[in-house]
Regions:
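Conserved glycine-rich beta-strand-loop-beta hairpin in the small C-terminal domain of fold type I
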Residues: 131-133
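ATP-dependent small-molecule kinase catalytic core of the GHMP/sugar-kinase superfamily
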Residues: 18-123, 136-170
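DPxDG-like acidic metal-binding loop motif
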Residues: 2-22
Length: 170
């Protein structure tokens, strides 16, 4: 949904010759959804705040294994849980881990077990608020163990990340 909203905003801005710059589009986009600004920014970045404070990061050259568990994950519910967690435990910043990881693995026992079985051998990462998990790798043979442990009702894909969003070229 968020990438669709951003794509629509960028396309209409260009098609209708509104000519808003990226900064103004991002300012409008933050009212449309937490990660819409990220998609308007259009390049590898780290988001802060509700996703509207963006800082470019180095390009990701690694290959990715994208794992899609067979569960639905509500973005709204994840933000509610994150707010509750911060109220109870205080606010901490760990730039090396997605803030939603701990919440995500508590929500589903199969995901939690998968994480426990594989996190010591692989650097598991969460995409956004979930539900996709990704692992960076160089050679597919590095993934032999984990591919055997992915539940049969989960999907997985071998990917290469784009360095810029295709909407940057509209």
């Amino acid at each position: 949904g968020s990438s669709n909203a951003a794509s629509t905003m960028v396309a209409l801005n260009r098609l209708w010759d509104i000519n808003l710059d990226t900064e103004n589009l991002i300012d409008i986009a933050k009212d449309e959804g937490a990660d819409v600004p990220l998609f308007i920014f259009g390049k590898n970045s780290i988001g802060r705040g509700i996703g509207e404070k963006l800082k470019s990061t180095d390009s990701i050259e690694d290959n990715l294994l994208l794992i899609q568990p067979d569960i639905h994950n509500s973005t709204q519910e994840m933000f509610i849980e994150l707010d509750k967690s911060r109220e109870e435990n205080g606010f901490t910043i760990n730039s090396n881990q997605n803030d939603f990881w701990d919440i995500y693995i508590k929500r589903d026992s199969i995901v939690r077990n998968f994480y426990k079985q594989n996190s010591s051998d692989y650097n598991l990462n969460l995409s956004g608020t979930g539900s996709c998990i990704y692992i960076r790798y160089n050679e597919k043979k590095e993934l032999d163990k984990i591919l055997k442990k992915i539940p049969s009702n989960w999907r997985f894909f071998f990917c290469k990340p784009l360095q810029y969003s295709p909407i940057c070229y509209i």
